[in-house]
Curated annotation (Swiss-Prot):
It comes from Alkalihalobacillus alcalophilus (Bacillus alcalophilus). GO terms for biological process: L-serine biosynthetic process. Pathway: Amino-acid biosynthesis; L-serine biosynthesis; L-serine from 3-phospho-D-glycerate: step 2/3. Its EC number is 2.6.1.52. Keywords: Amino-acid biosynthesis, Aminotransferase, Cytoplasm, Pyridoxal phosphate, Serine biosynthesis, Transferase. GO terms for cellular component: cytoplasm. This is Phosphoserine aminotransferase. Its main location: cytoplasm. GO terms for molecular function: O-phospho-L-serine:2-oxoglutarate aminotransferase activity; pyridoxal phosphate binding. Binds 1 pyridoxal phosphate per subunit.
């Protein structure tokens, strides 16, 4: 029986132990209510305090300006692929997309159903091994927005910085790297992120949106799919995912206790360096997928010399308590997802496994 598990799952992923222990302690009696937080009315003061605390912590940690609204929605980032063009892609405008992997492809696919689209840049030709140079972006005067995916979990690439554009709002899917580093929110018209990688459990999607961008009612769009509905109701138009938001609050408290975005970024850089150095020093035994200038701090993707070795390595890893190291089903190989809550000890243990496996191969 495995005594310790190292969780490298790509999502849902590792959660901070202090956040889980807090939930365990409060599960049956939240704030002396004699009820679980899951049992509270979303209109009650006890829950509304949690809701507000989560918003305030996120605003503090990301230094979100006051002219931006924080929304807690449902449906994952995948629903945002549809909601975004429904609300912004009006007649005569173009939804402009930068393709850096499968998730940006899916976002573009949904937008095509709703209006005119354009591919600003793509690295599909090189198997999504890199982020395109900003100078290659093809922009249009009538762009409704420019959409990017900040981190690409399947291919292990990440924007090291972000384009500064003035002609249209920059929209970012940050599902897999939000709050992994400091961020200038005012560079973006909107940021959205499913919580289940860096912010909490699955069930809640965080949207950070400039108020003047999406607070106007859009004709012919169903009420629940209008951002204006949720801005006006402070994400309480219908019953929100209360427990997921409660856990989000716990995780944000944990990040604050660690020292915030700058501290977590330093820790993430250290974790990624441990694994990337092991790959680079292996004399080709391990081969990274992403080009060095585009490497992700969240998802380290790599292969061994052949598929037989890949499978042997993954089997050995599983035997020793490593969970979630299989690459995405669409590309294979190996992937270590090292989101905020993955401890540095897990990365050190993975390095030792990789070195040991190479020596014995």
């Amino acid at each position: 029986m495995v005594k310790q598990v190292f969780n490298f799952n790509a999502g849902p992923s590792a959660l901070p132990k202090p956040a889980l222990e807090r939930a365990q302690k409060e599960l049956l009696n939240f704030n002396d209510t004699q009820m679980s937080v899951m049992e509270l009315s979303h209109r009650s003061q006890s829950y509304e305090e949690v809701h507000e605390q989560a918003q305030n912590l996120l605003r503090e940690l990301l230094q979100i300006p006051n002219d931006y609204q924080i929304l807690f929605l449902q449906g994952g980032a995948s629903l945002q692929f549809t909601m975004l063009p429904m609300n912004l892609l009006t007649k005569g405008t173009i939804g402009n997309y930068v393709l850096t992997g499968s998730w940006s492809e899916k976002a573009l696919k949904e937008a095509k159903l709703l209006g005119e689209t354009h591919i600003a840049a793509s690295t599909k030709a090189n198997s999504y091994q890199s982020i395109p140079d900003f100078s290659e972006f093809q922009l249009n005067e009538n762009d409704a927005y420019l959409h990017i995916t900040s981190n690409n979990t399947i291919y292990g690439t990440q924007y090291q910085n972000f384009p500064e554009i003035n002609h249209a709002p920059l929209i970012a899917d940050m599902s897999s790297d939000i709050l992994s580093r400091p961020l200038k929110v005012n560079q973006f018209g909107m940021i959205y992120a499913g919580a289940q990688k860096n912010l909490g459990p699955s069930g809640v999607t965080v949207v950070i949106v400039k108020k003047d961008l999406l607070n106007t009612k859009v004709e012919q769009v169903p009420t629940m799919l209008q951002y204006a509905t949720h801005i006006k109701s402070d994400s309480l138009y219908n019953t929100p995912p209360t427990f997921s938001i409660y856990m989000l609050r716990n995780v944000l408290d944990w990040i604050k206790d660690l020292g915030g975005a700058e501290a977590i970024a330093k820790q993430n850089e250290e974790k990624a360096k441990i694994i990337y150095d092991t790959i680079d020093e292996s004399n080709g035994f391990y081969v990274g997928h992403a080009e060095k200038g585009s490497r992700s701090l969240m998802n380290v993707t790599f292969n061994l010399r052949n598929e037989e070795l890949n499978q042997q390595f993954l089997a050995k890893a599983k035997e020793q308590g490593f969970v979630g190291l299989n690459g995405h089903r669409s590309v294979g190989g190996c992937r270590a997802s090292i989101y905020n809550a993955v401890p540095i000890d897990a990365c050190i243990a993975l390095r030792e496994l990789m070195i040991q496996f190479k020596e014995n191969a």
